[in-house]
């Protein structure tokens, strides 16, 4: 008798995606981050759902409702900190996942890669809107500064900003709509994840060598199910340590001050995971130029497949390209550090140099080094 998981219309889809899926045997732990992201999304949706049951999206009561969750709701404090720090874990996994894609040439599967970029934008938008909801000082001023960037768009900019605000400043209407979108977007992200996986399973997974691995496959279950569960347990352990020992480590103390439109904080900055893009934005003195650089710093990922000049897919056997990759990682860490610093000497010039280097590495140095490696290998 045939196993039901192979014949049942619904179970068959699950079986082909999670049980009998052929996976290259050389796939390393860097391929774990997809499942970790799925786990992060599940944690965020669950904790967010319970938080939404107690939260009120009104400027008069939003801050107090978050305080109420932490003080009066059973285990509300752990829900709130799991959700806030879960976002940090989400972005750590997200950036490593993208880094893996760049290092091992996963971007050559262009459909999967492009849906991934769309997912990145959706997650960033969700995180930004979520940061506004506690209605602290940094929530209010972060929302004001970031939405105001759209006013740099010629002709329609000012109208667009007021349309997003629902008035002439960030106020009750803004908070209400941000809560609505923050609740809705994770479900859209979950749907996009399905499309992401659909495209991935059309081509099959890449592997560290970058060489076709059709003759050497292993089934997803039990090998990768065990591997993924171990990864998820390690991530949840790290998240639990963060939540239970230093829940405010990655947050901003200013967000414990209720939003006050009459008092601007000395240093307005986003959460740590946006600091690299914020540093690029600030490094250009012109408003429109800064906004364009900000958008391009993420959108540049879309043209990475076009800049692939190497005859090899992966960087595994390309030491010069590896140097360029790690230089890019160091540059992004520098930008993250600069984004959290005040706008003064020497931080301004360091930020400008790091921003120029970021675009130079991706657009110029990586393709040139790849061509040089081709020449050295006489290809």
Swiss-Prot record:
Chief location bin: mitochondrion
Record's cofactor remark: Binds 2 heme b groups non-covalently.
UniProt GO BP: mitochondrial electron transport, ubiquinol to cytochrome c
UniProt GO molecular function: metal ion binding; ubiquinol-cytochrome-c reductase activity
Domain of life, per lineage: Eukaryota
Binding positions (heme b b566): 97, 196
CDD domains registered for this protein in UniProt: cytochrome_b_C, Cytochrome_b_N
Topology relative to the membrane: Multi-pass membrane protein
SUPFAM superfamilies the record matches: a domain/subunit of cytochrome bc1 complex (Ubiquinol-cytochrome c reductase), Transmembrane di-heme cytochromes
Localisation: Mitochondrion inner membrane
Keywords from the UniProt entry: Electron transport, Heme, Iron, Membrane, Metal-binding, Mitochondrion, Mitochondrion inner membrane, Respiratory chain, Transmembrane, Transmembrane helix, Transport, Ubiquinone
Transmembrane segments: 33-53, 77-98, 113-133, 178-198, 226-246, 288-308, 320-340, 347-367
GO cellular component, one term: mitochondrial inner membrane
Residues the record lists as binding heme b b562: 83, 182
Binding-site list for a ubiquinone: 201
Cofactors, names only: heme b
InterPro entries named among the record's database cross-references: Cyt_b/b6_C (IPR005798), Cyt_b/b6_C_sf (IPR036150), Cyt_b/b6_N (IPR005797), Cytb/b6-like_sf (IPR027387), Cytochrome_b (IPR030689), Cytochrome_b_C_euk/bac (IPR048260), Cytochrome_b_N_euk/bac (IPR048259), Di-haem_cyt_TM (IPR016174)
Family note: Belongs to the cytochrome b family.
Functional summary from the UniProt entry: Component of the ubiquinol-cytochrome c reductase complex (complex III or cytochrome b-c1 complex) that is part of the mitochondrial respiratory chain. The b-c1 complex mediates electron transfer from ubiquinol to cytochrome c. Contributes to the generation of a proton gradient across the mitochondrial membrane that is then used for ATP synthesis.
Other remarks on this protein: Heme 1 (or BL or b562) is low-potential and absorbs at about 562 nm, and heme 2 (or BH or b566) is high-potential and absorbs at about 566 nm.
UniProt-listed PANTHER family: CYTOCHROME B
The protein, known as: Cytochrome b
The species this protein was found in: Pteronotus davyi (Davy's naked-backed bat)
Gene that produces this protein: MT-CYB
